[in-house]
Amino acid sequence: MNLQEIRNFLKDLFSKPLGDGKKRHIVFWYDEAEDFIEDIDTFDIENVKVIKLNENNAFWTKYYIEKEDTTNNILVYSNMKKPKPQEDWLYDIFSYSQEFSTDRATVIMRELKVFDPLLKPEFETYNVFFKNKDRISAFKNLNIQNYTKEKIHIGILASLTKVKIMDIEEIIKAIIKDYIDGSNKLYENIKKFGNEDALWELLEKYYGYSFEEKSIERFMSMLLVTNMNETIKFELPKSYVPFISKKTTNCVVFINHFMNSIKDNEYYDKMQELVATKIKINNLLEKHDTDSFIECDVFEVIDKVILTRVITLLNDGLEDYEKYLNILLTRRKLYYYNKYVSEYKAIKWAINILNKKKALDSSIKSEKAYDMVKSYIEKYYYIDKSYRKFYYHYDKCQWKDEIKDLKKTVENVYNNWYLQELSIKWNSSISDLQSWRIDGVKQQDRFYRENIKFKGKERVYVIISDGLRYESAEELNTLLTNERKGRSTLDYMQGVLPSYTKLGMAALLPHNNIEINDRYDVLVDSINSTGTENRDAILKNENEKSLAITYDKVMDMKDAEIRKTFAGLDVVYIYHNTIDARGDNESTEREVFAATEDAFREIILLVNKLVNRVSAASIIVTSDHGYLYKRSPMEESNKLSSVKLEDGEDGRRFLLTSNNEEIEGTITFSMDYLLGEGSSKYVITPKGTSRFKVQGAGANYVHGGATLQETIVPIIKFKNDRSASSVNEIRKVKISLTSITRKITNIITYLEFFQDEKIQDKVISQRIKCYFEDEEGNRISNENIIIGDSRSENPVERTFREKFVLKSMQYDKTKKYFLVIQDDEDVNGYYERIPFNIDIAIIDDFGF
């Protein structure tokens, strides 16, 4: 600054408005270099008294300012070095005054209220940084307390990386994210306006970066390899060893926070992919057993390798199914599981199919019809369920090419073993029947009489979901059990034959007789049973306080309307059509399993609405029929030539006719069982899973035939519980910390947790995350996920041992730190904050 600039600057300084109760301006100017010692006498600033401070007049100066002249503005000039506060006679005056300096570092220090002269070299290092008002403002906004050299460096880095807190972890993430975006602007700004060496010194201090080359990519590689090394069970090759940091814990915590941050994890994904390719992680994994890296989730390729290996083992026919399921279970709580959740679940359900085949010794037993029905509802249905769940998840896979061979295995087992074996044995058992009715099995056409008619004053809601199979209802029953306070039970009945909508819907209505006229309309007590209006009339014939209505109409009703509509009624039939609507359409039949999941959600929404809006206490969910579905194309050998009928109704799975014909590959039943003796109507259905040839596409989803999948119709009975009793309340299992100690003495520590009870009806799983934080809520450890879903009676199998890695930092043993345990699926769910003391004397990665 030249003399005129100084005069102008001082003039502005003394002209500033007074604040904080001040009556005048006092400014100190230490000119140690004596650059202006000869000019000070020529300074003539209006209303400013200039005092020259030297070694001998400090006491006089103090006396003059405080006693003799208490009104004028004063400039105290000294050609001495600025004294330390403890050696400064005038420090009390200086502390409430302003300081003028011709060097930028001093000006900035004074502005920031930094009075330690030992820090001046650090500020001088950043002269270029402090030339910009925006950068100064960003630095000020960090509100740094108790300045140190390191805090200055971190503050500069935070300002340049646009991080608003003093956190080296956040600074590094910002630099990495910018680098991954291809910009690298933040790092260039550090080189231009900051101190590149200071950054790398901090990376060495906190993360152990020891390479000579200042490389962001090497640093990222070090973080990831160090983390990998902590969770694998084999020794890394020599070429990887330089990338293993000695500051293990900070690297582990950094990566854990990075991948678990919702706003940052997309950058983590890009980072790990970049590094995995560079250091050839795939080649490394090929040399080792899956068990040796089963708990490592640092690189996405690990999940791909594990999935590929399990698929290969399954396709090769190796039957170690429990081991494969345990592999999938282990991966559930790890980072990339959610990305590949559909693949993992598809594989799980494929394993369940294969495992069930193994449990059955690859054999479906020959039994009488009644026993076959019992075997189906107890064990065989599970294969249909597993097939449905496999395809539901397979259709959502992003990695279909890799899983398509497993699909072939599933198709082979389901079609060529299960459906074929089951249909052969079932056809054999029903061939002995004199009538379609199986003794001892509830009948669909007696549904109203047995479930509705004698309910007395209790209003009953019946939800009829078109195409809801028994295997699907088993899952829905579990969902209802765990959705609401109440009791839900599953039963079954033998559906009518042919198993198609027109007849199944009629069978569920109250009736004295069912007829099929010459046009093959189904009449209930002489009323055509097709359509909601006709069904409403049939219901009212039995009980005038009845109503038939569609699902969509109910769901569209406002609260007042639904209460008014249902007021005074005894019986409400609600017709729901999601599964059959999608399955029975050639363009959407592939979506039938997704439609089933949609149906679950819709039915649960309906149940909730009925309970909450009209206080429904008794709800029944049933169906008109089931269906057969296979994903693979129908073979020509599985199609029967179409039959021309003089009269009748036909479909891919049945012929309904007045002609009692013998057709090869079919089985025939008289309709007398339903229509009454002398009906002169017959149902002809292909044996097994064969279809009649019919023009057009859409042969994969069919119903109308006599298979167990088509004709075992579910009955779910849900009783809502409005009592104060807790018997039917739904609760999550509790996962509690069981470790007794509340003192941590090692930077790596293990804690034990316990699932308090097994999973069962009304007791559902809980997924929690747990981590340590300080009093201000800053995370200081990695995050662990615990999934409490064990069904075991054995307490040992409900115990979890989790590894916690603390940041390498100074801990205050007089302060409290907290283990946070919180529900990972519900922000309003379970939360616990358990106080701990951390007493680690000298911090390194071994805790000593």
Residue spans for each PLM region:
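…; additionally, a secondary subgroup of soluble metalloenzymes is captured
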Residues: 1-459, 469-619, 623-848
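Beta1/beta-strand and adjacent pyrophosphate-binding region of the FAD-binding site
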Residues: 463
